Design a protein with these regions (language model features):
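N-terminal secretory signal peptides that target proteins for export/translocation
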Residues: 1-4
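Bacterial N-terminal signal peptides
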Residues: 8-19
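Flexible, solvent-exposed loop/hinge segments and secondary-structure transition points
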Residues: 23-163
């Protein structure tokens, strides 16, 4: 009987040790919620309306998966896919999509072969506590205006997440 108790205690102790050790290895990851995505898109939409811009606004998570898409009135339909591509590019490559547009413009056409890359200005990573947690893509106006609107949305991330 004492032998059995000892075995049970040893097994319980080992189980506890393993579970604590495994828990210590799991990283904590901040994620972009739909509520925060709505607030980020609202900031970008306000900027677009202030400029009189007709654009598509896309917010994706850190894997480039769609969280939210808004197509403002009178925005061309083609901007939907372009906006998704810009946002996805900024998220999965963790840098503005303009980086790839600049590479192509400068003759580095190999950037066109990158899987999932849309080398067009207007995609901006959403950074929170030093980590890319998603991205925003804007399409419909000039490349610079698209990026400027996206930057306003991305800059609102900390406030959107905190509230």
């Amino acid at each position: 009987m004492a032998q059995m108790r000892r075995i049970v205690l040893i097994v319980a102790a080992l189980s506890l040790y393993v579970s604590i050790a495994m828990k210590a290895e799991l990283p904590v990851k901040k994620v972009l919620t739909l509520d925060a995505a709505k607030k980020i898109a609202a900031a970008a939409e306000a900027e677009a309306k202030k400029r009189g811009a007709t654009v598509v606004i896309v917010v994706v998570d850190d894997g480039g998966h769609l969280l939210l898409l808004e197509r403002l009135d009178d925005t061309q339909v083609a901007s939907v896919e372009v906006g998704i591509g810009k946002a996805r590019t900024a998220a999965i490559f963790r840098r503005p999509s303009k980086v790839f547009e600049d590479q192509v413009r400068d003759g580095r056409v190999a950037a066109l072969a990158l899987p999932g890359a849309t080398p067009l200005q207007g995609g901006v990573p959403i950074v929170y506590e030093g980590k890319v947690i998603g991205a925003i893509g804007v399409s419909g106006n000039t490349p610079q205006e698209d990026e400027d609107i996206a930057k306003v949305g991305a800059a609102s991330a900390a406030a959107a997440i905190a509230n």
